[in-house]
Amino acid sequence: MMQNDLSVFNEYESEVRSYVRGFPTVFHQAKGYKLWDLDGKEYVDFFSGAGALNYGHNDENMKQKLLTYIQEDGVTHSLDMATKAKGEFIDAFQNIILKPRNMDYKIMFPGPTGANSVESALKLARKVTGRTNVVSFTNGFHGMTIGALSVTGNKFKRNGAGMPLSNTSTLPYDQFLKESNNSIEYIENFLDNGGSGLDKPAAFIVETVQGEGGLNAASSEWLRSIEKICRERDIKLILDDVQAGVGRTGTFFSFEPAGIKPDFVCLSKSIGGNGSPLAITLVAPEYDKFAPGEHNGTFRGNNFAFVTGTEALNYWKDDRLEKNVQEKSERITSFLDDMIKKHPEMKGVRKGRGFMQGIMSPIEDLADNIAGRCFEHGLIMETAGAEDEVFKLFPPITIDDEGLERGLSILQQAIEEVTAESNLVAK
Amino acid sequence: MMQNDLSVFNEYESEVRSYVRGFPTVFHQAKGYKLWDLDGKEYVDFFSGAGALNYGHNDENMKQKLLTYIQEDGVTHSLDMATKAKGEFIDAFQNIILKPRNMDYKIMFPGPTGANSVESALKLARKVTGRTNVVSFTNGFHGMTIGALSVTGNKFKRNGAGMPLSNTSTLPYDQFLKESNNSIEYIENFLDNGGSGLDKPAAFIVETVQGEGGLNAASSEWLRSIEKICRERDIKLILDDVQAGVGRTGTFFSFEPAGIKPDFVCLSKSIGGNGSPLAITLVAPEYDKFAPGEHNGTFRGNNFAFVTGTEALNYWKDDRLEKNVQEKSERITSFLDDMIKKHPEMKGVRKGRGFMQGIMSPIEDLADNIAGRCFEHGLIMETAGAEDEVFKLFPPITIDDEGLERGLSILQQAIEEVTAESNLVAK
Amino acid sequence: MMQNDLSVFNEYESEVRSYVRGFPTVFHQAKGYKLWDLDGKEYVDFFSGAGALNYGHNDENMKQKLLTYIQEDGVTHSLDMATKAKGEFIDAFQNIILKPRNMDYKIMFPGPTGANSVESALKLARKVTGRTNVVSFTNGFHGMTIGALSVTGNKFKRNGAGMPLSNTSTLPYDQFLKESNNSIEYIENFLDNGGSGLDKPAAFIVETVQGEGGLNAASSEWLRSIEKICRERDIKLILDDVQAGVGRTGTFFSFEPAGIKPDFVCLSKSIGGNGSPLAITLVAPEYDKFAPGEHNGTFRGNNFAFVTGTEALNYWKDDRLEKNVQEKSERITSFLDDMIKKHPEMKGVRKGRGFMQGIMSPIEDLADNIAGRCFEHGLIMETAGAEDEVFKLFPPITIDDEGLERGLSILQQAIEEVTAESNLVAK
Amino acid sequence: MMQNDLSVFNEYESEVRSYVRGFPTVFHQAKGYKLWDLDGKEYVDFFSGAGALNYGHNDENMKQKLLTYIQEDGVTHSLDMATKAKGEFIDAFQNIILKPRNMDYKIMFPGPTGANSVESALKLARKVTGRTNVVSFTNGFHGMTIGALSVTGNKFKRNGAGMPLSNTSTLPYDQFLKESNNSIEYIENFLDNGGSGLDKPAAFIVETVQGEGGLNAASSEWLRSIEKICRERDIKLILDDVQAGVGRTGTFFSFEPAGIKPDFVCLSKSIGGNGSPLAITLVAPEYDKFAPGEHNGTFRGNNFAFVTGTEALNYWKDDRLEKNVQEKSERITSFLDDMIKKHPEMKGVRKGRGFMQGIMSPIEDLADNIAGRCFEHGLIMETAGAEDEVFKLFPPITIDDEGLERGLSILQQAIEEVTAESNLVAK
């Protein structure tokens, strides 16, 4: 396949295919924040594989480690047997990530996807409590398998199940309720009122920033209140850090600024370093209660991802990457504020934090149109929210100033063009 | 990590870890049917990553293709955007696999695991029929996420869900009923009797050989009857070929000898060629009814697996591999029959077909003890069945005579030792 | 309303009305085995309110007791407060029924219907075991509320729920499996096989004779095997004696001949004596674990039914009624055998036992046509089975020879007419 | 049983018994608003069988009609066959209740309890919409069978199910949310936000005044908003008028002042006139879609209740009863306001409307203690709310001034005594 031709996809791939519709070209090569299609056209990547490519494409150090590993016939696939590559990953994760943060968790390899991690945490929280209900939050997004989909708020996605999704209750996320600044009182009321119909949950599952749900960022105070609510009622706290974790918000775990200690932490996406499938579930030792093999899966031992994932952890040995993200986050924030001010016709609201920010607009199709215009001009960027009402800046966290400015510049141009041309109609 | 030391796993990994307990060593390198641990000890692999390594470890052609791809900074991770590597995989699958078999299916990339494929098929079958119940079979095994676990028969695994698993009904697999040769009459009776309590199912989900469930092989006649039952009642047929597919039974799809046409086919494990996470769901075009993005997932676009998976398909351009499997299957069969005859104290029954055969024994711990002894003597082999009552020969389908005989010889020694030493007690 | 006119029903009552369609007349008075409509036409009642009128209509002793009670302004409605009428009922039930049979049960008043009794037993069995699954049997019928409907086999009724019915599994009733004489081996296999997908049940719920399900009568041996299966596995046994109990099969409890001791017994229908709404749940003392008020209901204290129900228990102070039923059952049996022999074109099979016998015929509409013809000739009789394939003789158990013969004679005439006229076609 | 002795209840009745614990005496006779126990002690009844005795005990007209009916051997039990008594009930209900209110409903007889009516409406709403989710409200109470319990908010009761209750979502009732005057905005937000996780419901089920849930009275405006929400989204509206209906709030249907037109109305409790088990479901003709027999039940045809229920409808031929209730409601309101003012230590809040009013107090056990003291002084009154935090005045709606004042006077005395003696501690 040497031609930039989508016909093989159009003809043979299922209708469910999605991103290829928004980015209709055949990509071939990628490095850092850049992608090239088969025509050689270069794209700036403000999408980062929906958070799976936080370190950019084909990081050179990871690449070299992986090439050596493959060259030497290192074990590729190992289920949950012990391998040198896996041992080194565990060791690095323990010593670079957990210990310096005074975190004490058992590491579970639940299968290679974020949904696997979510499913394992849900199962374990139910098992250790003997309760079946799990509280999730409005606009939460946790995956497409039935267990994970049951705690996902998006109705279009839920509808794909073809059957009722049960054993879950949705409560309002931070700022979902319009009349108050937070939803804590409402949540406590539902939990404690003996007539609320909310069966005592095994766990809460929560994201610190809802990446798919529209870049809703919970405040640290809200997160601490949620933790307190759980602690006081013996409810387990599952922190789904699949999209917001691994540095995207400026710290390795997105919940570090809030200072909370979840009982379960779900990690995936960028944990493998280069976008290779890998997920882990961190489990507080007292809840590490699955019997051997009670949860399993074929691809728990993806050694390529162990190799690149281990190399990636080196980014966290000092605070340079953290600082880079935090500094550039401010640049993104000020850029977005500026756009909102310059284009009041967008009726834009800035959303999110760190390297997961964007603008929500009530204008019909605006976010989609801007993302589409960006693509034409060589910038990959996606939308988020139940109605795709947010455009979402997700650059690699390793991006340099040049890359960031190049992307922002294209985005600015797209905003200007779309707002100028469109007959803007609020939804 | 240069020492063969399990302490990092024992200390930091979750108790749910399983295979590392049966094979307590740190593996490092692997090639074809061989594995080496950090002490340099060589093992023959009759396990094949539970079916994910049908082509053996680090096949040289795949390895070279992959090295080149990585060297050239080919796209690693792409969600469901179009990439050259993905396009070539689709093209090869279409032209090498589907077209020559006169099969007309849309290819869905549901996420990288077999469970993802199963979940996508279950969701779609329910969606297109508007029915919620799905019939699965005794000892069926389809995965650990809630949707897939709901159709899995193993009670120990089901118990891990921590909640009731619903919208499924289990019916007896071929030869599960003792008094009759097949279960077809029973199934028809339950479906058609207006008082059986079996709500009309959206689909049947079935394996041709139950790999995890104890190497139960359905007859072609039974499979055709199941297809007929479905057709006559407008019930969709989901064929889970995750473990038995990709050549393990001697044909690419395990259901080819039966001549049936499932509505959905689940493939994973060896579809990526070298054990890299990849899964596809084949969907009859008339049921390709997910809206764009209605089912999604981060790791649908694992390009390393596309590269190696495409290369692997070359094995199917002629019939050499098929013939190799079919011939060596006969050797395995006669070896197992021989063992059963020589060691009547095992009360062994040969199970399975092709390169997924083994011996079921009612003797307490016998299968486990034999597998343990094999490991000591340098052969990796696992057990199967709800009570681990079967030891299971799963050599790579590319194995040569020397490898096969070496493995069988170790197995023979293990059987002889265990049966000689043990105080055999039937369960 | 003095005219025999159905227009008020046709115009204002819901389409769900059913018996009025088969017996299209307006009834007014009734005594013993006789009913009269507004035209004064007399009918013999071989229907007995589907088992709620085992003692016939308006038994004179009950009537007098009730008239006095009402005349004296006895408490009519009392929830679960103590009343004289309730105390006397409990006392009589204890002394006339339980003690002489060496039965030790707590009496629960779960609401006035059989479904209330079933729901209370299901809830309690789940609560005391901490398990959610309940095993029911093919063609079992337990009621229309969601809990009771979940354990009912009839698909037409289940479909009325408008949602999936969960937490139940159906296993084959005695003689449902065609190839064997009983289903015990199959049931044990499903329970004990670790891969059967049958989650360990809280309870089995079973009828001794399936009145709605087609007059399937379980053998005493089968019932004892079911009890043994439950005992050996710590599964609770719920005996639904709503239709077969209170003397219909010749003993007060239908399970007396089998000699089993259920953990929960559901009674309703004729327990109130004259067809007034009343139900009780007998609970083995060790499982009497509902907290006060954890299950409740407005009509638990129907004192009219306590009064008539207490009077009805006097029938059980000696064995005259039992003997009457047992003797007349033989007459019914021989009559039905004779009909089957004389009319082989019915392809009839005799079903049931005691005063719940009938003939199953595979001939399209035969049972319905015979019941319809009986109605024309002055006999009320209904059909049963998922396809209404059985006509069902349900005379009052207090019927005398004259009444029985009169009914049988009408039935014989109907059979002769229908078999003579019809173009009989097997389904 | 001639002695006022509870031993038969204590010894033989299940522990689940409840009211007998609060009112520990054996009642025997009753008339109007009076009850007598076996010692001849007289009690004023401010309980009215939890709403089943709205017309008081043994109303003389109903009694005479019933005596005549029984004397003449009228049909007692008739399933859903046509009887004279049933026809007259339908006719009266149509002509006295529905027609004058311009209401067009089919009448369904779903079984004799409120829960039967609720279950039938839930099933039918799901069936006609093809959706499974039903929205209920905080502190709603609809019954103890699994379908009805699933829409009941009380956690203690829900826990009795022993299994997860699914296919329902709870939303905040009027004034449940503290920060705003009504919950309408919140509800609309949950329904319309594509990410709220609230699957589109088949129906809302709502009470106008939550009798068991703590006498929460929805405003007419709130009810109209709920109706509007349903209409605009094609959601069915089920009005559970089991407790608040049949005159308890001053109009026959409690929703008359709000002017709404529910799709389904559930009636029971006092619909039978004298506390005999009877329930009806009113179904908008376009949703009368059960097939004949798709929902059934043994005690749908309780003719005694038809006779007394028909007689009771005569109370609604003119507006005297309505006026009586409305006038005396004002007396109750002013009495309660006065008590709250005189006894600020109760921290009382008046709740409810019409003849279902009471006082909520946060003081630990206050409501229970007052009800207990009332009983000692000869007044029957119960508590309500998830924590029994409300005492609840439920006199017969036919009560005269003397009876009302006598009851209020006892209540006043009890309040004075309890507040004087108690060491009042807020919960």
From Swiss-Prot, chains A, B, C, D:
It is an enzyme of class 2 (transferase). Pfam families: Aminotran_3 (PF00202). Gene3D superfamilies: Aspartate Aminotransferase, domain 1, Type I PLP-dependent aspartate aminotransferase-like (Major domain). GO terms for biological process: ectoine biosynthetic process. CDD domains: OAT_like (cd00610). InterPro entries: Aminotrans_3 (IPR005814), Aminotrans_3_PPA_site (IPR049704), Dat (IPR004637), Ectoine_EctB (IPR012773), PyrdxlP-dep_Trfase (IPR015424), PyrdxlP-dep_Trfase_major (IPR015421), PyrdxlP-dep_Trfase_small (IPR015422). GO terms for molecular function: diaminobutyrate-2-oxoglutarate transaminase activity; diaminobutyrate-pyruvate transaminase activity; pyridoxal phosphate binding. Its cofactor is pyridoxal 5'-phosphate. It comes from the Bacteria. Keywords: Aminotransferase, Pyridoxal phosphate, Transferase. Pathway: Amine and polyamine biosynthesis; ectoine biosynthesis; L-ectoine from L-aspartate 4-semialdehyde: step 1/3. The modification N6-(pyridoxal phosphate)lysine is found at K269. Belongs to the class-III pyridoxal-phosphate-dependent aminotransferase family. NCBIfam families: dat, ectoine_ectB, PRK09264.1. This is Diaminobutyrate--2-oxoglutarate transaminase. It comes from Marinococcus halophilus. The gene is ectB.
